[in-house]
Amino acid sequence: MIGAWTVGEQTTEELLAGLPIPAPVIGAHPGVYSPSVDSALLCRAVLGELDRRRLDGRAETTVLELCAGSGIASICAALVGATVTAVDDTAEALAAIDGNATANGVAVTGLLTDVRALPASVTADVVIANPPYIPAPPTASAGHAWDAGDDGRDVLDAIIDALPARVRPGGGVLLVQSDVCGVDQTVHRLDLVGFSAAIVDEVPLAFGPVMASRAEWLEQHGFIAPGQRTERLVVTRAVRDAEV
């Protein structure tokens, strides 16, 4: 976990305990983002999406997780029968994904690359991501797993812009982010690239240590209201047609 964050840890545990399958066993791996509230939200979302596809008669589904970190969402998908590829840009994360998948008795294919350099041939029925999304001042350091440029959208926008080539016909997308970096912007950008989108899940949360440490900077730059110390973590679901 990113430091002591009692509210976040409690919410993470509650979300994982409420999954329709037993929560995956995830080991501690130095240098790799540990499962947190956003990770648990993505797990819940992908399991719901795969269940929806099964009910629609699409039992065989490929899943591509971008910015996979520990691989917990990929492992959830694999546990219910999906064929899964997990992408991250650090060797530490790839080792964690492999180790965690093995510990849970599933196969997850790992790819070591930046999502912006992912070959066009890598596609899937369902693309999921919990990317870095925290706005970061120029002086920020050591925040590879959560910092995402001065507006928090560097990685998120790159993922969205590549979706038309990444998502197979009839497929969908699940993205997790904080409302601090612009949920409406995400929905609008998805619309621009040909996807209908809607918010399908959210959790209000007190700031964790990273957000709290730069709250004053976030206030000064208009990301949060004066005195605000809470955020909403949201899941956006997008599809190629009007059914969201």
Where are these regions (language model features)?
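Conserved S-adenosyl-L-methionine
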Residues: 180, 195-206
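SAM-dependent Rossmann-like transferase core, predominantly class I methyltransferases
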Residues: 2-80, 96, 219-243
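Conserved beta-strand signature within the Rossmann-like core of class I S-adenosyl-L-methionine
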Residues: 170-176
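Short strand-turn motif at the edge of the Rossmann-like AdoMet-binding core
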Residues: 132, 176-179
